[in-house]
Amino acid sequence: MDNIISRGEIEDRIARGQAIVIYEGLVLNLEKWIKFHPGGDKAIHHMIGRDATDEMKAYHCDETVEIFRKWRIGRIDQEWENFLPPIQGGVFRFLNQQHDSTDLGLSNKWIAPNTSDQFKFIKNEKHMCGEPDVKIYPKIPQGVIPSLNLKEAYEKKVVTDPATVADNYDNELVRQDLETLPDLDPKTQEWLSKEYNKMHNEIIEAGLYQCNYFRYVKELTRIGLLFALSYYLLYHRDQKFWSAFSMGCAWQQLVFIAHDAGHISITHHYQLDNIFGMIIASWVGGLSLGWWKRNHNVHHLITNDPIHDPDIQHLPFFAVSTRLFDNIYSTYYEKFLWFDAFAKKVVPWQNYLYYPMLAFGRFNLYRLSWMHVLLGLGPRRGKAGWFRYFELCGLIFFNYWFFYLLVGCKLQTGWDRFQYIMVSHITTMLVHVQITLSHFAMSTSDLGVGEGFPMRQLRTSMDVDCPRWLDFLHGGLQFQVVHHLFPRLPRHNLRAAQPYVIEFCEKVGIKYSIYGFSKGNGVVLTKLQEIAVQAKTMLECASAMKKEATGEREADEKTYRTKSIKNA
């Protein structure tokens, strides 16, 4: 019989540095497991103090789910109200500091924190699991359930500071979300969770987790033909441009299979899928699957949060939220993302620079991949501990066959080498468009810890409407809403799962966002333009206020000099 653990004791344990997560009413202490977690430490950090039942079931197979139970230290005997995790700025108290009148549970009242030390470095030593080095306050204060009745969550403020301009814009987006989404109270979110799990069970019973391996034979055949065509055009026809283009097309298609393998959605066997994915990503594509998984796992859990989701943290080049104007501290990268002089020049024009910037996206992935492997940012222990060395060998091999043998030895002139590299890499731009298309135009609001898993995924993700015969070109990224709800679902079954999601959305009253590829790109560009306009407005406001202050000082100095002359 499991011990009953009170809310106060759980708060105390988290304050003492334990990684406490709630799963199906069980209290799990993952403090010792976190260093072995194949999905990385950040994914667990964002679930501390929360009921992560839906997330844990969505991202893990049944065998792994059973392993969770070995880490239980007791259970709860009440409906759980989520704490704000330490990594997101949560405050936790020891037992002797707790009082009934100051419970950290969810409330319908606004609790305004003193944010004067926002993003300031914490002087005392860290003691909580995942606690960042700087002080972080969420947009919605700890323990608050935002609603339309709670005007503090979205009201516009009198502009006394340039930053208020951007803050008012973000508040308006929060208001729009509160108007269109179901209530955030615990009962409504619990109902959404139950309906989501009913849908999940229907998808399981329909056999949609069974992978059609013949479809992957077709995918690999197509990719193999593209590589063969690239080789033939270069070595037998001396068609450098079209050879590079074919190479880029093959890489673009490879990314989708690596994505599937990273989610363990092909064989559903952890080691097999990861080995397959690493061969494709590192050895053939020159990218780290481990980097992508660490990044992507956090993205799935805290989708479109400007402070925590690395997939929308692209300063100084892009900003998809005005909150990024604030010199925020990224809890993923563990550093400040400065809205510096360069960003102030680029972001106001980001809707025009969007496609040119994405054309060079693959070069940035090389940088991130090498940093991940060399710095050992992935798991160093457990069943994923050896991946780092396998990927390092893969990255070296890729640089040998592509940059040395093909570019360095086969191509004779500097211009030919430059052209081949640029054409092959710019061709992969399409996949970067497809990735950003799914989320850049969607909600970036912070709606507090009361928001459940299914609602967050639906409001932050977009699907792309395309004919079945074009599914190969999008590689499953056209079903990002479905994928975010069921990350382990085989890619070729996402279309079959789509009707279940549409029916679910109609039942619970959440918009299912889907656009054609052209229309979707237009929506993204419109969002980027809106943020660009806000950046221009804020910067113009700052400039005007500075001039006004300077003008007043000059007028005061002139008056003082005049009086001094008269007195003399």
UniProtKB/Swiss-Prot annotation:
Transmembrane spans: 241-261, 272-292, 352-377, 389-409, 421-441
Membrane topology annotation: Multi-pass membrane protein
Upper lineage: Eukaryota, Fungi, Dikarya, Ascomycota, Saccharomycotina
Protein's UniProt name: Delta 8-(E)-sphingolipid desaturase
PANTHER family associated with the record: DELTA 8-(E)-SPHINGOLIPID DESATURASE (PTHR19353:SF30), FATTY ACID DESATURASE 2 (PTHR19353)
Chief subcellular location: membrane
Species whose genome carries this gene: Lachancea kluyveri (strain ATCC 58438 / CBS 3082 / BCRC 21498 / NBRC 1685 / JCM 7257 / NCYC 543 / NRRL Y-12651) (Yeast)
Listed EC numbers: 1.14.19.18
Keyword Electron transport: yes
Domain Cytochrome b5 heme-binding intervals: 2-77
Motif annotated as Histidine box-3, chain positions: 480-484
Entries under SMART domains matching the protein: Cyt-b5 (SM01117)
Swiss-Prot/TrEMBL GO biological process terms: sphingolipid metabolic process
Motif (Histidine box-2): 296-300
